[in-house]
Amino acid sequence: MRAIVVALLLAVPLSAQTRKPPARKPAPPVVALKKVVPEVTCPTPLGVGLKTKVTYCEVMAGRDPAGGVLIPIPSHKGPATLSFDLHNLHLYSEEQVRAKRAFSRYTATIGVLTMDNTLISRAIVQSEFRTAVDLVDRVGGGAGPGGAKAVAPTGTEPITISIPEGEEQVSLLGEKLMVERIDGTAAYTQAGRPIAVISNVALEYKPGPPPRKPKR
């Protein structure tokens, strides 16, 4: 039996006895997520918060994405994540607060659209105002105390939207604002009317491959 085993070993080529398994290909490098603050095109800026120093942008009602709040999306692999804070807009009156007639309940709806007017998602913020403590901040650039404007953001809803791969820019447009007050309820949808306010816009994405150089 031993002689047979030796004979079989001799019959196998030496290269087969010493052949190594093929080397495994190294795994592709993991591309880290990148987070940036995009250069937002805001047609109707509200202003900068006096306390927070945050920039606020009004989102107007409309139907044409080119006229909305434009947010460029860098080249990305897979979906990109767009995040921002969504606020309602309140016209502050100290007299109404003192008279206990300032109560307002706001429900604002905006759309996030591609530039060919395809709806990606909607975002909603609902909040109530009773006194000045319900304001997120006062905004500079007005004639009020400390240079504050009469209008101010109230309520905050953190929004996160997934932007499909291939989209290079999105637009935010207002859809509808519902306002409930002591004297009744009203709905606003007409184009050009402020619907909501955004702040703290950010993007998180996995960078896409660099563009190929044209062959000469």
PLM regions: where:
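Short amphipathic, basic-aromatic surface patches that mediate peripheral association
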Residues: 80-102
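Sec-dependent signal peptide recognition
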Residues: 1-7
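Short coil-to-beta strand junction motifs in C2/discoidin
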Residues: 95-108, 191-193
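C-terminal edge strands of extracellular/lumenal beta-sandwich accessory domains
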Residues: 35-36, 74, 150, 159-216
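Non-catalytic, beta-strand-enriched accessory regions in extracellular/secretory proteins
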Residues: 54-74, 79-81
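Compositionally biased, proline/threonine/alanine/serine-rich low-complexity intrinsically disordered stretches
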Residues: 8-10, 14-39, 211-216
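Extended, solvent-exposed segments with strong compositional bias
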Residues: 47-60, 120-166, 179-182
